[in-house]
Amino acid sequence: MITLYQRTDCPFCWKVRLALAELSLHYECVDIRLGERHPVVQELSPSGTVPVMSENGIVVWESGVMLDYLDRRYGPGRLIPTAAAEEVRVRSLHTYSDRLLGACLFKLVKEKRSRPAAEWDQDVIRQAQRDWRVCQQWLDARIAGREFFGPQFGAADCALAARVGVAAAYGAGVEREFTNLYRWFEAVRRRPAWEAAYPTGFASSK
């Protein structure tokens, strides 16, 4: 049995849940609160952060490696294409999501969840929104003429969908002018895996 230590609204955890759902895999979820130092997570992961996934003595503490593992073990080619050019594309987009898009959206999310709305730093939010528009434009060009970011719904789509989903939850969804990206996200939201993997809640300041 796969065990996933996770925080429900963490985009790294969300993308892993999406992959598990797309592969129709059963797993046990251990939920961790924001800021909690869970003893098992501290023991299994050198970073002390979620997600952490274990199965039959195999421990994986990096979300991208989790998708590699799931693809290799349960669905060769389902998440990571086997053709070299498409594999490079999917892995590059996955990295873009984790590093560049993640850094852009984290500023907005952190500001909105860490303090009441009346205390938000609007300069931080406006800059994050400008950066998000740049990312949307770039992604819109990458998805033009394609149904998914890979040859089928896979690792890049899981990663990007989770990031965009978090942005939408904090009031910064895909803008309609980015028609290709908007169409893609609407299609993702109709997939059964989206509902199955959707967070049970999002952190916010009261």
Which residues does each PLM region occupy?
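GST-like domain detector, emphasizing the conserved glutathione-binding G-site
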Residues: 1-126, 130-133
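A local structural micro-motif
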Residues: 28, 175, 196-197
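Conserved residues at the C-terminal ends of beta-strands
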Residues: 56, 161, 200
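GST-like fold's C-terminal all-alpha helical module
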Residues: 97-190
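Long hydrophobic alpha-helical segments typical of transmembrane helices together
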Residues: 180-206
